[in-house]
Amino acid sequence: VVHRMPAHTRTVCLEFFGNAKDAVPSIVEIKDFMFAEQKRSGVLLAGLEHLDDRYLKAVGYATKSKRAAGSGSGLPKMVLIGDIAGENADDVARITSEVVRLANQRGGEGFVAVSAEARKKFWLDRKRTAAISRHTNAFKINEDVVIPLPRMADYTDGIERMNIELSL
């Protein structure tokens, strides 16, 4: 089934620093909020991608937050990139702001792109991770495993432990 894209789309980039266990619940909260909002207003989450710090490092991610200077590597622990789309521009703007607010409650910072060019820049890092994944086994587990969203923090911490143990 092919669906027509709604008339108005905004892209959010949400950066989270610190512990994954503190940040990951925002994925579930945003998903739940957006599914309810789609039923209420027709505004939908047209895509949501999670990038962890390994991917961010691999693609040379340019952190948008000013907080990066005090975070050791300068990279967020996790980034979410998502498209929020609908037929009513005001509804899309309001709901996008609410998604940023939800991220703020979990220590995240949100950045919003409105123009097609700015939106494309937000998605460019995700596109680069896909290219890297095609040419290396470094991220193979992400392609082969479906992780229940509420357990994403456990997965992230577990992979980090394995990376440290196996890097000896």
PLM region spans:
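Noncatalytic alpha-helical scaffold of FAD-dependent oxidoreductases
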Residues: 1-168
